[in-house]
Regions:
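Aromatic-enriched hydrophobic runs in primary sequence
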Residues: 14-15, 19-22, 74-81, 85-89
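Hydrophobic transmembrane alpha-helices
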Residues: 1-70, 81-156
Length: 156
């Protein structure tokens, strides 16, 4: 259990390091390359599926750092790439079984995609980068926690 937690943290930190090490500091929406958001989205989805593979599983629910990955992706990589990664992670979640938790994850993904996109439209006008990242992270974690609470109360 602790090993999976450390593997997830390591995967997240390595993906952040490699992104900032090998990318141009110009934001994606200002670049001319149209294929770059798709490439970054596929990379985000691939990292999310790897994190899901090494997640901690309790009662069929996978616990990992995908929420953090999505918050960082929405803030620093861009909306289009993060949404592509979110779709890829959601499809990858169905590889682990077609159960009610997978469909709950689909609903969470739709909400996180819509709310994070709206937040990134309004937050930069009022807050600095760190505050925006904290708000996105809290949104993702609270949404996941609330959905997990609803799912667990319906089981009993």
């Amino acid at each position: 259990m602790l090993g999976n937690f450390l593997i997830n943290a390591g995967i997240l930190l390595l993906s952040i390091y490699f992104y900032f090490k090998f990318t141009n500091p110009t934001p994606l929406y200002r670049r001319r390359d149209r294929w770059l958001p798709m490439l970054y989205g596929l990379a985000i989805g691939f990292v999310g599926i790897i994190m899901l593979t090494f997640s901690i599983v309790i009662e069929g629910v996978h616990f990992d750092f995908r929420g953090m990955l999505l918050a960082i992706a929405f803030k620093f990589v861009g909306r289009k790439a993060a949404l592509i990664g979110l779709i890829m992670m959601t499809i990858g979640r169905f590889q682990f079984g077609f159960d009610s938790i997978s469909f709950t994850n689909l609903m969470i993904a739709l909400y996180i995609g819509a709310s994070s996109s709206l937040m990134l439209y309004y937050l930069p006008k009022r807050f600095n980068d760190f505050t925006q990242l904290v708000v996105l992270l809290c949104n993702n974690l609270m949404t996941t926690t609330f959905a997990l609470f609803l799912f667990m109360t319906n089981i009993t």
